[in-house]
């Protein structure tokens, strides 16, 4: 996944800087050059990258820093802040409210994945207790209604539209919204015709649909492959209708995702979701601070809980969250997380653990890593329930290991390798022991409980050392004003 490559490049640059014996101007320049190269390859605008590098050098004036200052931490924090600045539009997204029907209108270019994204958006909210419905007001593209109907049926979401009998998109939108309001749907999503920037007639149609239904929110859906051109496209749509938020699609397959995100931010339009694949659950809430935290290998604890809630069946969530908060990590949980990794890619569950973002799927070796997960899962398929659910690896005696190897058609040393991987992951997940993880995804509760003692448990020793140990961590949290801000830096506080 391209985002993982960008994150891997940036986190490696910071790691190399941290490993240097002495932090001098040469080391700082090498670090910034690597980060600059990675951002330019992601199609981030040259001026933004240049300004970021200049700002970091101003903040991190090595000659003026008094002895005793932690230069590594100051550099890391400056990189974090500047990346957030590039991606932050400085304007919060509109918040939908339960209890009253909200109408959301989707607009976008042809081929951006708008119709599929409508269903993903509805599905995301349906899993969180909303009652969504879909209205197809796209009468321009042949097959638009059939596509929406197929997607909605698969996701078990009610839909409204007409393939042949009605050709007026305004009437379809108005009738559909009224129908679903009567059925007490609290999230009504209207899909409009996809269009090109220069198509004046279709832009006029979009305005008419908007004026007729007066949506609470207009979402612009944009393909990440257009990169820096996102600025012009987003501006064109903003001039026609009141775009309140943006969803960037196809972030899994293009090198220009960083450029698209940064240029959308320049239009002051908040990005609220990113599409990371074709499947219904390959759809992530976009929040700048957790996103940057993950790119830098700092993790995203709030995203971890949200991902668990997305992937694990509702009735199993409390049990899994409780096990993780107790530090229990079994082979069965590892099996399930490998399944999640295969579904979600490298920016899935493991990337949300601090200091662990790129280890499971190294850059350029994604297919090799996926094949390894499948081999491990085949071995675990030959295990008993007792073996899968035990937290004591010693029960896997030599005779059991030989039985597992025979049953899975693998070699004994491959089973041993899988068990070593399990021990390593169990050690990392044990860092979550003692954290009060909310069972219903209330991340404000997690933020309130995230004091310096708890934070030190989940930070890798190397990162804790970089910020000056427990004393440095406490001072940093004090300087940043609150535990909530600290959670922001290390990936928390990400809501819907």
Curated annotation (Swiss-Prot):
By sequence similarity, the record places it as follows: Belongs to the GTP-binding SRP family. SRP54 subfamily.
User: Which compartments is it annotated to reside in?
Assistant: Cytoplasm; Endoplasmic reticulum
UniProt-annotated stretches for the region M-domain: 297-496
- Where GTP binds, per the record, is at 108-115, 191-195, 249-252
The protein's job, in short, is: Component of the signal recognition particle (SRP) complex, a ribonucleoprotein complex that mediates the cotranslational targeting of secretory and membrane proteins to the endoplasmic reticulum (ER). As part of the SRP complex, associates with the SRP receptor (SR) component SRPRA to target secretory proteins to the endoplasmic reticulum membrane. Binds to the signal sequence of presecretory proteins when they emerge from the ribosomes. Displays basal GTPase activity, and stimulates reciprocal GTPase activation of the SR subunit SRPRA.
Q: Which SUPFAM superfamilies match?
A: Domain of the SRP/SRP receptor G-proteins, P-loop containing nucleoside triphosphate hydrolases, Signal peptide-binding domain
* Annotated GO CC locations: cytosol; endoplasmic reticulum; signal recognition particle, endoplasmic reticulum targeting
Q: Region G-domain: which residues?
A: 1-296
Biological processes, Gene Ontology terms: SRP-dependent cotranslational protein targeting to membrane, translocation
Reactions this protein catalyses:
GTP + H2O = GDP + phosphate + H(+)
Report the SMART domains cross-referenced here: AAA (SM00382), SRP54 (SM00962), SRP54_N (SM00963)
Q: How does it assemble?
A: Component of a signal recognition particle (SRP) complex that consists of a 7SL RNA molecule of 300 nucleotides and six protein subunits: SRP72, SRP68, SRP54, SRP19, SRP14 and SRP9.
Q: Which organism is this entry from?
A: Solanum lycopersicum
* E.C. no: 3.6.5.4
Q: Which UniProt keywords are present, listed alphabetically?
A: Cytoplasm, Endoplasmic reticulum, GTP-binding, Hydrolase, Nucleotide-binding, Ribonucleoprotein, RNA-binding, Signal recognition particle
The keyword Nucleotide-binding is assigned to this record: yes
Q: What is known of its domains?
A: The NG domain, also named G domain, is a special guanosine triphosphatase (GTPase) domain, which binds GTP and forms a guanosine 5'-triphosphate (GTP)-dependent complex with a homologous NG domain in the SRP receptor subunit SRPRA. The two NG domains undergo cooperative rearrangements upon their assembly, which culminate in the reciprocal activation of the GTPase activity of one another. SRP receptor compaction upon binding with cargo-loaded SRP and GTPase rearrangement drive SRP-mediated cotranslational protein translocation into the ER.
Name assigned to this protein = Signal recognition particle subunit SRP54 1
InterPro entries this protein is in? AAA+_ATPase, P-loop_NTPase, Signal_recog_part_SRP54_M_sf, Signal_recog_particl_SRP54_hlx, Signal_recog_particle_SRP54_M, SRP/SRP_N, SRP54, SRP54_euk
Q: Give the Gene Ontology MF terms in alphabetical order.
A: 7S RNA binding; ATP hydrolysis activity; endoplasmic reticulum signal peptide binding; GTP binding; GTPase activity
């Amino acid at each position: 996944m391209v985002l993982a490559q960008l994150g891997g490049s940036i986190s490696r640059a910071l790691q190399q800087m941290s490993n240097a014996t002495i932090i001098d101007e040469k080391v700082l320049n090498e670090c910034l050059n690597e980060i600059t190269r990675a951002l330019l390859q992601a199609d981030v605008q040259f001026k933004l990258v240049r300004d970021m590098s200049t700002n970091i050098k101003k903040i991190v004036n090595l000659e003026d820093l008094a002895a005793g200052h932690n230069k590594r931490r100051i550099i890391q924090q400056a990189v974090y802040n500047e990346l957030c600045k590039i991606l932050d539009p400085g304007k919060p997204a509109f918040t939908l409210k339960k209890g009253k029907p909200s109408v959301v209108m989707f607009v976008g270019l042809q081929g951006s994945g708008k119709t599929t994204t409508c269903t993903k958006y509805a599905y995301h909210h349906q899993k969180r207790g909303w009652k969504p419905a879909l209205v197809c007001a796209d009468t321009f593209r042949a097959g638009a209604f059939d596509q929406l109907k197929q997607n909605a049926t698969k996701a078990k979401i009610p839909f409204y539209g007409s393939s042949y009998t009605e050709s007026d998109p305004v009437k379809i939108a108005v009738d559909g919204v009224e129908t679903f309001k009567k059925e007490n749907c609290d999230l009504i999503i209207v899909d409009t015709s996809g269009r090109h920037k220069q198509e004046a007639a279709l832009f006029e149609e979009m305005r008419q649909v908007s004026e007729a239904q007066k949506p609470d929110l207009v979402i612009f859906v944009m393909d990440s492959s257009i990169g820096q051109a996102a600025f012009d496209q987003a501006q064109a749509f903003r001039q026609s209708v009141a775009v309140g938020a943006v969803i960037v699609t196809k972030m899994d397959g293009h090198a220009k995702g960083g450029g698209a995100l940064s240029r959308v931010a320049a239009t002051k339009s908040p990005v609220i979701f990113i599409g990371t694949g074709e499947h219904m659950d390959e759809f992530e809430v976009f929040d700048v601070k957790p996103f940057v935290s993950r790119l830098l290998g700092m993790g995203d604890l709030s995203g971890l809980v949200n991902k668990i809630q997305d992937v694990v069946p509702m009735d199993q969530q409390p049990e899994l969250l409780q096990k993780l908060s107790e530090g229990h990590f079994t082979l069965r949980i590892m099996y399930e997380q490998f399944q999640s990794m295969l579904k979600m890619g490298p920016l899935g569950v493991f990337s949300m653990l601090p200091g662990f973002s790129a280890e499971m799927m190294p850059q350029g070796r994604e297919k090799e890593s996926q094949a390894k997960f499948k081999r491990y899962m085949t071995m675990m398929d030959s295990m008993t329930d007792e073996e899968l659910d035990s937290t004591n690896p010693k029960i896997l005696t030599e005779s059991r290991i030989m039985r597992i190897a025979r049953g899975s058609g693998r070699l004994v040393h491959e089973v041993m390798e899988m068990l070593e991987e399990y021990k390593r992951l169990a050690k990392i997940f044990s860092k979550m022991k003692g954290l009060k993880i909310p069972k219903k995804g209330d991340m404000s509760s997690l933020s309130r409980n995230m004091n310096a003692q708890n934070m030190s448990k989940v930070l890798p020793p190397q990162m804790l050392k970089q910020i000056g140990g427990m004393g440095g961590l406490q001072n940093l949290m004090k300087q940043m004003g609150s535990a909530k801000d600290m959670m922001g830096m290390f990936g928390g506080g990400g809501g819907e």
